[in-house]
């Protein structure tokens, strides 16, 4: 089964057009190529590869999940999953890989290493918001290189006051997940007060906790405290503070192992042993379930909802079998779909903007590439409809699911059944809806 994944771009005349994603696509004749010495100009000689980068946390399952999806996107460049890399405009695609360590230092260092290749066109990454904000996004923006993230969710990355001009993301803004979790807590469960526990110094964790507190307050609830974990903040002391505050629910947005340590500490006190706990996708891990054992039962986990993906025929009958052949297993979440879409948008933008000079040299203007992404409207990808706005947010909305342990996707795969689902759009949220 073949299905071409096409971005719909708004061209200067205002018409919406679609391009074909197969090997028969040809670059435009040279007409307005960028200056040879210009900072945005990449020249790809005959027989030379197009260089793309990946900047991921490959020590985690989510990072390797994304990497596998990028490989499948390259496989599908010729319009079929056949286990062999396709070509883009007659050129092989070579992916340069760097580790971002889920840290600002790792993100900056990895980005600096990637731009040592002067012909680097674009990068898929980062895995962690902390590795991007003021780190990888700053380095790559200065170098005029696109950074398209499949899994960054921190709201500040696309805040107009902070967003870097070459930064885009396919993952939904965490303002949407925070709003959905607040709906679950306040509306569905009737919990009126909460304490949040975040990873000290981590952008994703801090901002998701903060956005949840804002959403809960807007609904009429109360955030009693936002507590850091990690570093000099022992989990036993955090549990005692939570017991003293007596909230209706605790939201933990920290990573492993601090997340399970905090949950274990909460479960160890008589006053909080039955206190409802919600964790974010950062803590929705097999390690958490193993560490808590029987105490994990009933712990809720929120994450992007990927159960809907198999409703799509291309995903179910094309992508998923290819993923299984390549990896021997199933994807663990939704970020693999974001990665496939992110790569497809980059490839389509290259097709639309590249020009060929006499002699066959392919010229890619990275500035035209950036503008092409800003023109994406109504692209129907694996992860849903994408429209890339001026802030760099491309996901039009978010589907969020809440699962009750042990029925988590990491344990049950696609068979995991959410206890709560919510669909939010960025337009709704911006309007306060």
Across the structure, where does each feature detected by a protein language model lie?
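N-terminal secretory signal peptides that target proteins for export/translocation
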Residues: 1-2
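Extracytosolic ligand-binding ectodomains
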Residues: 5-9, 20-433
């Amino acid at each position: 089964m073949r299905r071409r994944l096409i971005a719909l771009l708004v061209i200067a005349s205002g018409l919406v057009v679609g391009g074909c994603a197969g090997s028969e696509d040809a670059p435009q004749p040279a007409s307005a190529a960028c200056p040879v010495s210009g900072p945005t100009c990449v020249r790809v000689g005959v027989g030379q590869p197009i260089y793309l980068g990946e900047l991921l946390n490959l020590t985690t399952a989510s990072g390797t999940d994304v990497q596998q999806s990028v490989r499948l996107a390259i496989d599908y460049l010729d319009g079929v999953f056949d286990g062999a890399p396709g070509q883009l405009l007659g050129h092989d695609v070579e992916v340069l890989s760097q580790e971002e360590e889920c840290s600002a230092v790792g993100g900056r260092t990895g980005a600096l290493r990637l731009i040592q290749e002067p012909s680097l066109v674009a990068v898929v990454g980062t895995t962690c918001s902390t590795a991007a904000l003021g780190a990888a996004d700053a380095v790559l923006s200065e170098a005029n290189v696109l950074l398209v993230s499949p899994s960054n969710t921190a709201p500040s990355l696309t805040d107009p006051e902070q967003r870097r001009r070459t930064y885009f993301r396919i993952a939904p803004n965490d303002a949407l997940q925070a709003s959905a979790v607040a709906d679950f807590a306040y509306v569905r469960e009737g919990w009126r007060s909460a304490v949040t526990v975040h990873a000290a110094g981590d952008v994703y964790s801090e901002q998701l906790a903060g956005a949840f507190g804002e959403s809960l307050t807007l609904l009429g609830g109360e955030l009693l405290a936002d507590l850091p974990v990690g570093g000099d903040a022992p989990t036993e002391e955090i549990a005692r503070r939570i017991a003293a505050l007596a909230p209706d629910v605790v939201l933990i947005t920290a990573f492993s192992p601090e997340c399970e340590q905090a949950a274990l500490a909460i479960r160890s006190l008589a006053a909080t042993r039955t206190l409802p706990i919600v964790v974010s996708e950062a803590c929705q891990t097999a390690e958490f379930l193993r560490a808590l054992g029987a105490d994990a039962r009933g712990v809720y986990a929120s994450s992007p909802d990927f159960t809907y993906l198999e409703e799509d025929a291309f995903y179910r009958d094309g992508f998923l079998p290819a993923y299984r052949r390549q990896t021997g297993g199933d994807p663990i979440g939704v970020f693999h779909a974001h990665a496939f879409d992110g790569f497809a948008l980059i490839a389509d933008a290259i097709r639309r903007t590249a020009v060929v000079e006499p002699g066959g040299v392919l010229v890619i203007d990275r500035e035209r590439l950036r503008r092409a992404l800003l023109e994406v409207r109504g692209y129907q990808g694996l992860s849903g409809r994408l429209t890339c706005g001026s802030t760099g947010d491309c996901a039009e909305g978010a589907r969020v699911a809440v699962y009750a342990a042990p029925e988590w996707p990491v344990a049950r795969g696609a068979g995991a059944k959410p206890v709560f689902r919510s669909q939010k759009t960025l337009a709704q949220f911006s309007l306060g809806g």
